[in-house]
Design a protein with these regions (language model features):
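Short S/T/G/P-rich N-terminal loop/turn motif that feeds into the first structured element of a domain
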Residues: 1-54, 61-67, 71, 94-96
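C-terminal structural segments of small proteins and small subunits
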Residues: 63-91
Length: 96
């Protein structure tokens, strides 16, 4: 079974306190579902459109696990804590 990844790009952080509250709740929810944070932070170097934005890469054992964790009660609580604190782009990508 192919691995799957959450790729999350933060276009804008509007409220660092809400982001901190989200981080406190989201990491345990992600880890409980078998997610592993592979990378997080601001890009070291950007090409193409040149956007040096915060990016997070999380690995799961399968697409099903990635979606289940996103839809879980615990992760949804983390998203509620984030609220309008950030503008993000999040996607689930299947590994090859």
């Amino acid at each position: 079974m192919a691995k799957a990844y959450w790729v999350v790009c933060y276009r804008e952080i509007k409220d660092p306190n809400k982001l901190a509250a989200y981080a406190k709740l989201s990491l345990p929810a992600i880890q409980a579902g078998g997610g592993r944070v592979l990378a997080r932070g601001t890009a070291v170097k950007a090409y193409e459109s040149g956007q040096l934005e915060r990016t997070v890469l999380i690995e799961f054992d399968s697409v099903e696990h990635a979606i289940t964790v996103h839809d879980s009660r615990a992760y949804q609580e983390a998203l509620k804590a984030l609220g309008d604190g950030a503008v993000r782009d999040m996607r689930v990508v299947a590994g090859s």
